[in-house]
Amino acid sequence: MRYLLDTNALLYVFSAPSELSARAQRIVRGEIDLSVSVVSFWEIAIKQSIGKLHFNMTIPNLESLCLGRNIQILGLGSTAIERIKALPPIHGDPFDRLIIAQAQTEDMTIVTCDKVIPQYPVKTVW
């Protein structure tokens, strides 16, 4: 199975691992196909710049940590971007909508504690 960390799960991995569920901790520690979207890096950078996120790590640092833990970084392709148009307007967060579309396009399971994401036709775990 292929897993895509959403932004909150990514932040927990590197700042508060005890906040991850037991299942999410097993996924992160395991030898599995684990990825993060570049969308999460955009979200973190934007929220840091407007003062909505206090996460004392630069994006290049975060990228290095991900790669050091064999977490692949996925770019966002036009197919996933196009897929957003077909998503129902359940979730108002554009970053989460991009992650949902990417997971659907790549046939991945999203690791998330977000309560709204599972309302979409996408696989999730927490």
Language model regions located:
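Alpha-helix capping/helix-boundary segments
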Residues: 9-10, 40, 80, 99, ...
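Generic structural signal for small/hydrophobic residues in well-ordered secondary structure
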Residues: 7-8, 44, 84, 103
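Short, well-structured N-terminal submotif of metal-dependent ribonuclease cores
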Residues: 1-36, 52-64, 106, 115-119
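Short alpha-helical
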Residues: 19, 42, 79
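Active-site regions of enzymes building and remodeling cell-envelope glycoconjugates
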Residues: 121-126
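Active-site neighborhoods of divalent-metal-dependent phosphate/nucleic-acid chemistry enzymes
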Residues: 54-60, 68-113
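Phosphate- and divalent-cation-binding pockets in alpha/beta enzyme and binding domains
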Residues: 43, 83-86, 119-120
